[in-house]
Amino acid sequence: VLFRSAMSPVIREQHDEYPMITDPKGRMIVGQFGSYVPEMLKMKNFDLEPGDVILQSDPFMCGGAISHINDWIILVPVFFQGGLVGFTSMFGHMMDVGGPVPGSMPTAATSIFGEGLRIPPIKLYEGGVLNQAALDLIMTNTRTPEMNYSDLMAILAGCRAGEKRIIELCERFGADTYADACDALLERTERAMRSLIV
């Protein structure tokens, strides 16, 4: 979904993005960049409801899952029959997020404050309603608003595709079976890693 929808070459051609699916505790079930969800939710206590979408780009508020503010993370809580069954998430590298130089990666920066716009975890959508003021503020602070907007919506579409598949699994097998399968997958992965290390 993301590669077919993204506009910038950073995502479309370089594939500088990573997806993730977690259980309700934020433990990564599928993914590549490590789960930042427990760390972020601990720092930012959101009341999550269906239709919410969280956006952030702050490396200090995601347990180091991203390394710089060009990486925008979308987090979508997945609900089934009123209960939280997990999260889908994806980050993608944005072409420009403001700051003193195009591309927002200044070699002379001595702190994160010299890089550009840092986004703390915010609700981009709340109950399915877009936070237009937040989106306007973010897009006003980039040199590439059209690309950033397109890529952001493509990332969200990718998360929504994951959300849809999780709900389909819960409808087919039940939420309890889905949760048990997630636990079994985590336990199997732990056993495999222990056997490699020991």
Regions found by a protein language model. Give the residues of each.
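Gly/Pro-rich turn-and-neighbor structural signature
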Residues: 6-62, 170-198
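Terminal presequence/propeptide segments associated with secretion/organelle targeting
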Residues: 1-15, 29, 33, 37-47, ...
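Acidic side chains
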Residues: 16, 23, 52, 71, ...
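N-terminal leader/propeptide and maturation segments of large enzyme subunits in energy/redox metabolism
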Residues: 1, 115-194
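A short, hydrophobic, proline-anchored segment that marks a local hinge/packing element in signaling
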Residues: 71-81, 89
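Short, solvent-exposed loop/edge-beta patches enriched in aromatic
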Residues: 24, 80-83
